[in-house]
Amino acid sequence: KSFGDHTINLLAGAEQVEYTYRYTGVYRSGGGSNDLTESVNTLDASSQKTYDGGYETARQSYFGRIQYDYLSKYLFEANFRADASSRFPKNNRWGYFPAFSAGWRVSEEAFVKDNVDWLSNLKLRLGWGRTGNEELASNDIYPAVPTYAYGNTMLGGNLYSTAYESRYVNDQLQWATVTNYELGIEAGFLNNLIGFELSLYKKKTDDMLLYLPIQGVIGMGAPAQNAGSVENTGFDLSIFHN
């Protein structure tokens, strides 16, 4: 929407994602042939077992954006997301991720347009933003929920089937966050015959979702933890000719 020299654009939305996975299988033992058809027909039918399973995940999101433009010279944008993931415990299910950017089209200023005719475009921009990550390296679906394994144990000379908690659970698990910083310049010369774009960036990931080793004598698997940080810095440069 435009109001004289001012232009404002607004966007708001919501998203609901649900994923369901199911599998079924049949197992037989005793085959000794490399021929698949022959092997299946000669397998021990009494050893046949069927199995099935699956899992479900869900994510709910709300998001919004506002863009402001004054005389095509001064630009501002703000974004905000709120995401909830079923992978995290209820107390940390929601993550909130803002982002901001601003730009100045120096080439639209009168003191440039009237005095530097060979400069077609000059824009300075600055950005900061934060996003979230819910993925574990092992693609663990329920890192904050107790899971159980099955086995056998001898007791009083008899063999019993058992179920036991296979790992510790971290009820403080939360979103990993990725924070981006960017400073850039865009320039075009001689009616944009030639030009370049240069961006300096810094990307920092905090509270990475990892499994840190624990002592084997504990007898249970390691819990997922927010335990890592990574930082990357660099630049991107592109040069063009039309």
Residue spans for each PLM region:
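Extracellular/periplasmic, surface-exposed regions of secreted and cell-surface proteins
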Residues: 1-242
